[in-house]
């Protein structure tokens, strides 16, 4: 079994943990590869371009926070990912630093559970070529630096859903419901729910609210504006600047992200501890 390791190279503690992991793997004669940037930061030779790691590795290890896990998931495709939290929030990363070796041992023994997470798949035609992007959390279209408020036109299965003026629109999976969508007023959705949520960003109408839809729906969005360029972001990474009238199609991806589960974690407890969900405020505490 070969491990593909992706590290948040901007965190000293993540790099230190990666160095410790190398020693642990070598002592057990286990094969591993780092992505090129991580390998350079750690000064190790066992490396591969991250785009090729999926063909060489059986299991991925993400050392960082939720952002590192999201980044890793774009290249792991359907391979299992062990998420180790070396960040601040750690909402998606299943294991703490102290639990890392135990999690790897379970994978080696085959005694682990997988949490399948739905992805979004976005398509857009660019110069007669169809571009494809995926997102574990969300696909977001924003007004960017456009000085006026554009109109976002939305269709579901070729039927008009709405057209409203706003600063942007978020299409999120159940996994991504606790990310940008939540900050924009969207609902918390349990991860295994087969739904998406469409959340407006600062809409210009009080009647516009987030809407939860079945994840078998096909969503089409375009920006109605006389000019301008509008950022298309997938999991926080800008993929393209959309022109007015360019249609972005979003649907459920056939490829699931497979996260190695920490069976000691409970989603309700995570909401309380990570998001302080429903906690009573007690002055002085």
From Swiss-Prot:
Keywords from the named record: ATP-binding, Cytoplasm, Kinase, NAD, NADP, Nucleotide-binding, Transferase
EC number(s) given by UniProt: 2.7.1.23
Catalytic reaction equation(s): NAD(+) + ATP = ADP + NADP(+) + H(+)
InterPro entries in alphabetical order: ATP-NAD_kinase_N, ATP-NAD_kinase_PpnK-typ_C, NAD/diacylglycerol_kinase_sf, NADK
UniProt cross-references to PANTHER family, sorted A to Z: NAD KINASE
Functional note: Involved in the regulation of the intracellular balance of NAD and NADP, and is a key enzyme in the biosynthesis of NADP. Catalyzes specifically the phosphorylation on 2'-hydroxyl of the adenosine moiety of NAD to yield NADP.
Protein name per its UniProtKB record: NAD kinase
Species of origin: Chlorobium phaeobacteroides (strain BS1)
